[in-house]
Amino acid sequence: MRESIKVLQECAEIQDKKSRDYQNENSRIRQADYYPRGIMSIMELINTKTIRLWSVLEAMENDPNYAPNFESIEDSLKDLINYSSFAVAYSRGKIDGQDPDRDFLNRKKPSTVKEIRDAEGQ
């Protein structure tokens, strides 16, 4: 098996384990609640994680003795893989708790011909 496939399997396992904490059955919180701006909220998470990763990598590049305190480079990269999978799932309308009457940016979808025409600028 290719190593990249193994990495994806590891990411799926991490996602499954973390989801038990973030969307546990004893809470009313659903995954979609974390993304009030839809895919834009997920992109903000990706951006934040990427900036943190750049910061750590630059520190490691400039100081051979530097090591991250809490999260390894591999952990951060796996988080990015999982966040990307959330973005794809959200764009498909398949995130737990996602409102089917809202689009991938969490905007209300037009429901009438007039609303559709107004949305298209006609």
Please place each PLM-identified region on the residue numbering.
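Intrinsically disordered, low-complexity regulatory regions
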Residues: 1-122
